[in-house]
C-alpha cells in the first residue's frame, strides 16, 4: 500500500472512532433522560393513586351527606 492510501485509511479510522465516541456520549445522555423520565413516571403514578383515593373518599362523603339529606326530607 502506498503512503497516501495509509494516510487516507488512518483518517477514515480516526473519523470513525470520533463518531463512535460521539454516539457513546449521545447514548449515555439518552440513558440519563430515560432514567429521569422513568422516575417522573413513577412519581406521577403514585400521585395519581393518591388523587384517586382522595376522590373515592370525597365521593363516599358526598354520598353519605346526600343520604342524610334524603332521609331528613
UniProtKB/Swiss-Prot annotation:
GO biological process: division septum assembly; FtsZ-dependent cytokinesis
Organism superkingdom: Bacteria
Chief localisation class: cytoplasm
Alphabetically ordered keywords of this record: Cell cycle, Cell division, Coiled coil, Cytoplasm, Septation
Coiled-coil region(s): 3-66
GO CC terms, sorted: cytoplasm
Subcellular location: Cytoplasm
Primary role: Non-essential, abundant cell division factor that is required for proper Z-ring formation. It is recruited early to the divisome by direct interaction with FtsZ, stimulating Z-ring assembly and thereby promoting cell division earlier in the cell cycle. Its recruitment to the Z-ring requires functional FtsA or ZipA.
UniProt similarity note: Belongs to the ZapB family.
Protein name: Cell division protein ZapB
Organism whose genome encodes this protein: Shewanella oneidensis (strain ATCC 700550 / JCM 31522 / CIP 106686 / LMG 19005 / NCIMB 14063 / MR-1)
Gene name in the database record: zapB
